[in-house]
Amino acid sequence: MNYILFRKSISSDHFIADFVSCTASRNQGGYSCQEAFDGSVQNSGNGWAYDGQVPAWASFKLAEETKITSLRLVSGIDRNDHRLITFKVSMHVNNRWVVPGDLRVKEDSEAIIASDGTITLSTGIHVASLSFNPISNVESVRIDVTKTDAGNNNLVLTEIIPNFADALPLSKYF
């Protein structure tokens, strides 16, 4: 059984991450970056998308500075595409962007991780669990996307979930 980590739960299918706002290079109609932290992981019509206009980015502000040791990126739920392939995650700490060290993707042992932190997955996967050296005082998390497995290079980032202390199992997708 897989677990997604978070602080506040509503039910086994919904949770609330401690993000409070976001900005993005583009928000596709009906797919605002705010939907990537609304706690809904069971709907293909929910999440952040950008009309396939890459490179694309979204930055998610946390409610308070916190220590993050892992991050889950859920994409393309109820789809056979619109999932991440090439992307980069960085954390805003003390007025600068930091790339996580010792970065790994749990579900893809063949993922290529460049020296600048850019991750290229071997195939599209619905859940990318990123582990890395702990980063303290994180204010925001940013994802830069350059490639997906969709024909139009669009993404639906269903949820972005930072590691927090409590765990709750999610149902059929994980």
What are these regions (language model features)?
Residues I68, L84-K88, D102:
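Exposed beta-strand and adjacent loop surfaces of beta-rich binding modules
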Residues S122-S140:
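Short, surface-exposed tryptophan/glycine-enriched loops
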Residues M1-A63, G76-H82, K106-G117, L121-S122, ...:
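Disordered, acidic Ser/Thr/Pro-rich linker "stalks" and the adjacent N-terminal cap
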Residues V54-P55, A63-R72, N137-S140:
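Extended extracellular/luminal ectodomain segments enriched in beta-structured repeat modules
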Residues I4, L71, V89, I160-P162:
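Extracellular beta-strand elements of beta-rich domains used
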Residues N95-D102, P169-L170:
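Surface-exposed loop/edge segments in extracytoplasmic proteins
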Residues N80-N95:
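Short, surface-exposed beta-strand/strand-loop-strand elements in extracellular ectodomains
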Residues I143-G151:
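Short beta-strand-plus-loop segments that form exposed binding edges in beta-rich domains
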